[in-house]
Curated annotation (Swiss-Prot):
Coiled coil: none annotated. Residues 204-388 form the Helicase ATP-binding domain. This is DEAD-box ATP-dependent RNA helicase 35B. The keyword Amino-acid biosynthesis does not apply. InterPro entries: DEAD/DEAH_box_helicase_dom (IPR011545), DEADc_DDX41 (IPR044113), Helicase_ATP-bd (IPR014001), Helicase_C-like (IPR001650), P-loop_NTPase (IPR027417), RNA_helicase_DEAD_Q_motif (IPR014014). The Q motif is unique to and characteristic of the DEAD box family of RNA helicases and controls ATP binding and hydrolysis. Keywords: ATP-binding, Helicase, Hydrolase, Metal-binding, Nucleotide-binding, RNA-binding, Zinc, Zinc-finger. A zinc finger (CCHC-type) spans 576-593. Residues 399-559 form the Helicase C-terminal domain. ATP binds at A217, F218, T219, G220, S221, G222, K223, T224. Pfam families: DEAD, Helicase_C. Disulfide bonds: none annotated.
């Protein structure tokens, strides 16, 4: 004790950690509730308006207080994150639920659009980009070139044609104004085609002038002629200027998602080439490049030199990768049913095909269903594109009478026989699964109905013979999966039966579009039951309302709890329905197709992580 007193008397300061130093550093703890109350009082005083008094003299302002240390008796209070967040929330403008959902949709679309451009790898690596479309030798007649813009717009409105793009060529109401060779005009008249349809009125001048194009029109509107005739003219011009040599070509390429559609397009091309050759024009050699056919027969045509190739992605990629054919001179590319081709299933194959192009090309994309997301992605491959739209993308053909029936799953096969009595043959029956196709065909054959079947599990000869006999009216019923739903043109079909409702509404639109073609009226009957999701039924309900069709009671009683929000979002964004798949009954955040693609992408990433083979490559 004496030593400690002596040290204190000598003025020695206490060491750190002693009780005396702890007392000097001590800071009184203020409870959270008290700090919040003090902060609320401070904010109340700060926002309280000053009271005016005519008699009272304003008090002098208090001397400035140092903010570094609080005054004696006061406790330093720091602004908490909760208070800051509350203040920011008060100051932020009020956002409605519809605006919040719209912002979420924009973020999702921006994220989905963040994909590599649909361009050759060589062009991306070298930074090559084209600012102007290619030029062709075709020019419209003088009277069309001098047509006032107001007159052209009035014609488009009368045909319900919507165009988007710069320097859009004027529409042409006659095939004669397009300067097509007389043999082609005779072939058109021989098929009973006297006047162009709305998509042909505007689409043909755009394609003939060399512009990149996205063509959207309902099923059965004549989209095939819009890309076939300009391709024939381009190949004819190339052959006249510089004849093709063995092993060279093609000049033009058409890619289709199915063998049946590719074969049908090839037949249309041959229909126009035959009269041209008879009239003395140079020979134009087309090639059908599809799977299931001996590659040696295809190679014989390639060795002679080929002008036009109609192909499916798989066989085309195979020929290009094996260097059996090249696209060095290809200047014309068409993607038929483009929404399917640039979708997740075929996107990798299409990218590989694009990598084989060596120069600029004219690119045309066509489909009846082209959602906004697909349009935005497809534009990455186009140069100053022109969008020609006849009706809403994904709208049903108004010449089709749509009937929806609630049928229990076990009663569908019996009710199918009753539905076959509605109209005379031919009738097309669609199923989701291959097993159902075989089962229905066998059942109909046992009942004495002449039926044939098509699905992906059958070889090419079986599919070819079945389709040929059905098209020639030798068979009454064709049972098929969705391989027969897109693009196939059988004008005499009067009735389409959906044995089960497809999960994606765009497949439904393509299915029912096999009837009601070329201005004729058709009937589409669809079976629904408890297996369909609410989203699918809402899409179907809105499509029936848009087409002014009768609603069955089960769909009429189906309520959408978010209908008001969807209407508000559609008014603000200008996009009706889902921007991903085109369905009218849901928005993109509830899109089943988008959720399915996310799960597929996640599964791919997981398989890449675990590996596919090799040392410790499989777990």
């Amino acid at each position: 004790m004496a030593a400690a007193a002596a040290a204190a008397a000598a003025g020695d300061s206490p060491r750190r950690g002693t009780p005396d130093s702890d007392e000097e550093d001590y800071e009184e703890y203020v409870p959270v509730a008290k700090r919040r109350a003090m902060e609320a009082e401070r904010l109340r005083r700060a926002t309280k308006p000053p009271t005016t008094n005519a008699v009272a003299v304003a008090a002098p302002p208090p001397p400035p207080r140092s903010t570094s240390s609080p005054a004696v008796g006061e406790v330093a209070v720091k602004t908490s994150l909760l208070v800051k967040a509350t203040k920011l929330k008060r100051e932020a403008p009020e956002v409605t639920p519809a605006e919040r959902l719209l912002q979420q949709e924009r973020e999702m679309i921006e994220h989905l659009s963040d994909r590599k451009a649909l361009m050759p790898v060589g062009e991306i690596a070298k930074g090559i980009s084209y600012s102007e479309p290619i030029t062709t030798g075709w020019r419209p007649p003088l009277r069309l070139r001098r047509m006032p813009r107001s007159r052209a717009d009035a014609l488009r409105r009368s045909w319900h044609i919507l165009v988007d793009g710069d320097d859009v060529p004027p529409p042409s109401r006659s095939f004669g104004d397009l300067r097509l060779p007389e043999p082609i005009l005779r072939a058109l008249r021989g098929k009973g085609i006297e006047k162009p349809t709305p998509i042909q009125v505007q689409g043909l001048p755009v394609a003939l002038s060399g512009r990149d194009m996205i063509g959207i029109a309902f099923t059965g509107s004549g989209k095939t002629l819009v890309f076939v005739l300009p391709l024939i003219m381009a190949a004819l011009q190339e052959e006249i200027l510089m004849p093709i040599v063995p092993g060279e070509g093609p000049f033009g390429l058409i890619v289709c998602p199915s063998r049946e559609l590719a074969r049908q397009t090839h037949e249309v091309i041959e229909m126009f080439l035959a009269p041209l050759m008879e009239a003395g024009y140079p020979e134009i050699r087309p090639l059908l490049c599809i799977g299931g056919v001996d590659m040696r027969t295809q190679m014989e045509v390639v060795k002679k030199g080929v002008h036009i190739v109609v192909a499916t992605p798989g066989r085309l990629k195979d020929l290009l990768s094996k260097k059996k054919m090249n696209l060095d001179n290809c200047r014309y590319l068409t993607l038929d049913e483009a929404d399917r081709l640039v979708d997740l299933g075929f996107e990798d194959d299409i990218r590989e095909v694009f990598d084989h192009f060596k120069a600029q090309r004219q690119t045309l994309l066509f489909s009846a269903t082209m959602p906004e997301k697909i349009q935005n992605f497809a534009k990455s491959a186009l140069v100053k594109p022109i969008i020609v739209n006849v009706g809403r993308a994904g709208a049903a053909n108004l010449d089709v009478i749509q009937e929806v029936e609630y049928v229990k799953e076990e009663a569908r096969i019996i009710y199918l026989l009753e539905c076959l009595q509605k109209t005379p043959p031919p009738v097309l029956v669609f199923c989701e699964h291959k097993a159902d196709v075989d089962y229905i065909q066998e059942f109909l054959l046992l009942k004495g109905v002449e039926a044939v079947a098509i699905h992906g599990g059958k070889d090419d000869e079986e599919r070819k013979d079945a389709f040929k006999s059905f098209k020639a009216s030798e068979k009454d019923v064709l049972v098929a999966t969705d391989v027969a739903s897109k693009g196939l043109d059988i004008p005499d079909i009067q009735h389409v039966i959906n044995y089960d409702m497809p999960a994606e509404i765009e497949n439904y639109v393509h299915r029912i579009g096999r009837t009601g073609r070329r201005g004729k009226t058709g009937v589409a009957t669809t079976f629904i039951n408890k297996n369909q999701t609410e989203t699918t039924l809402l899409d179907l309900k809105q499509l029936l309302i848009e087409s002014k069709q009768r609603l069955p009671p089960i769909l009429a009683d189906l309520d959408d709890p978010q209908e008001d929000d969807k209407v508000a979002i559609a008014q603000q964004s200008g996009v009706k329905g889902c921007a991903f798949c085109g369905g009218l009954g849901h928005r993109i955040e509830a899109c089943p197709k988008q959720q399915l693609q996310n799960s597929v992408t996640l599964a791919r990433a997981r398989s890449d992580y675990f590996g596919g083979g090799g040392y410790r490559g499989e777990i």
